[in-house]
Amino acid sequence: MAETLSGQTPIFGGSTGGLLKKAEVEEKYAITWTSPKEQVFEMPTGGAAKMRQGQNLLYLARKEQCIALGSQLRRLKITDYKIYRIYPNGETAYIHPADGVFPEKVNPGRQKVRYNDRRIGQNPDPAKLKFSGVATYDAPNP
């Protein structure tokens, strides 16, 4: 997927500490978002920057930094951010949110993972399952 990313880089007086040098050999990450106004936000690499009004684009060395910046943006009521992985050959892959809905939100098509239709008090006694090889959360309903 060769998607071209567009947007302005936020105004930042510091540096990434050379973290993006590794991206020339391995990979880097980009986060894009739209801001209704110019405002200051905390950079995940340290320091503060001023985002521009409209479309913003920022390159970071790690996916975790993009996720951390996304949580900063959500505090500022900006929820339209997207995270991309950019490979050294220029190929771009959209990685977060994978199906367009954030993980903590309900999506009608999303499958439930490790869901048991019971209350915590209805879990089986762990002492009875101790050497059976079955975890309490995986045990069938009584």
Swiss-Prot record:
Q: Please give the GO cellular component terms listed in this UniProt entry.
A: photosystem I reaction center
What Gene3D superfamilies does this protein map onto? Photosystem I PsaD, reaction center subunit II
Keyword Disulfide bond found: no
Any Gene Ontology biological process: photosynthesis
Question: What domain of life?
Answer: Bacteria
- Keyword field: Photosynthesis, Photosystem I
Tell whether Zinc is among the UniProt keywords. Answer: no
Protein purpose: PsaD can form complexes with ferredoxin and ferredoxin-oxidoreductase in photosystem I (PS I) reaction center.
Q: Which family does it belong to?
A: Belongs to the PsaD family.
Instruction: State what protein this is by name.
Output: Photosystem I reaction center subunit II
Instruction: Specify the species.
Output: Mastigocladus laminosus
